[in-house]
């Protein structure tokens, strides 16, 4: 016993305890460091498993008057409004744009919109930009990134406050398929070299379209895709995925969530860079193996979004062809629609 009546072994234990803690901390750190290294590939890049998920910032909004949400009244009972992985599917009636506008304005958000106006497709650019000024991200800061081989043909369109246009000169290709596929390469390159320093989100659209109704911050998320208007009612077996195993875009017939349109996708600059870089690398590998995916960059986009689930999915309101599909009652609004054209004349 010591002078305070405690057993000597008890005092000994108290003396050893700090040493044991130090040993455990040291070896625990080494173990965790080893595990962290296991999540990195041989090239030193962090594996997808360690990437940050879509964490929406919590911002303080001002007092606002708006209808109270009712937990017993579905916002839409005629369509799916959430994916199985709990990503929202954006339809008219599923969001309050006033609340969202306040949230994104308080974050001082800047949105980039990329569009490719190559060869004869430059004729669609004026209508694209004019309608974007009317309907796209109204009230927010926007940078239009126009990729073109004809910079002198880019029209002068009056832009609102906080909005500007940047012309990026790129080469053209003989085949329209190559023009389409090289979009991924260009977006990937400029995301790394420029976009990440200038904008918070990227939206990638087709130039032979026009905005016909509101397209705003409700679409913004870490990674979003848009349901293809021709397949939103179809079963996965009917999707026009790439079905040849030789291609990097191959998807088996028993897999698939949705069929996404190649003409409208986006997200944070980081996630768009990951997507476009992966698709470009897959297309390069296909080319080396003498195969071209059935729907080119769209096929690779669908493969990517199958295994990298988007954090938000846009309904076909955001890509529509009224001439081919009419205006079904389920579509409360048609927001981004195809412009009638002669594909053969434009592509050749």
Swiss-Prot record:
Binds 1 Mn(2+) ion per subunit. It catalyses: an alpha-L-fucosyl-(1->2)-beta-D-galactosyl derivative + UDP-N-acetyl-alpha-D-galactosamine = an N-acetyl-alpha-D-galactosaminyl-(1->3)-[alpha-L-fucosyl-(1->2)]-beta-D-galactosyl derivative + UDP + H(+); an alpha-L-fucosyl-(1->2)-beta-D-galactosyl derivative + UDP-alpha-D-galactose = an alpha-D-galactosyl-(1->3)-[alpha-L-fucosyl-(1->2)]-beta-D-galactosyl derivative + UDP + H(+). Mn(2+) binds at residues 206, 208. Residues 1-11 are cytoplasmic. Glycans are attached at residue 108. One of its GO terms (biological process) is defense response to bacterium. Changing residue 107 to R: In allele A2 and allele A4. UDP-N-acetyl-alpha-D-galactosamine binds at residues 116-118, 121, 206-208. Pathway: Protein modification; protein glycosylation. It is found in: Golgi apparatus, Golgi stack membrane; Secreted. Residues 33-348 are lumenal. The active site is at 298 (nucleophile). Keywords: Glycoprotein, Glycosyltransferase, Golgi apparatus, Manganese, Membrane, Metal-binding, Secreted, Signal-anchor, Transferase, Transmembrane, Transmembrane helix. Changing residue 164 to R: In allele A2, allele A3 and allele A4. Induction: During a Nippostrongylus brasiliensis parasite infection. The expression is a transient event, with a maximum at day 6 of the 13-day-long infection. Its EC number is 2.4.1.40, 2.4.1.37. Changing residue 53 to M: In allele A2, allele A3 and allele A4. Possesses strong A transferase activity and weak B transferase activity. This is Histo-blood group ABO system transferase 1. It comes from Rattus norvegicus. The lineage of its organism: Eukaryota, Metazoa, Chordata, Craniata, Vertebrata.
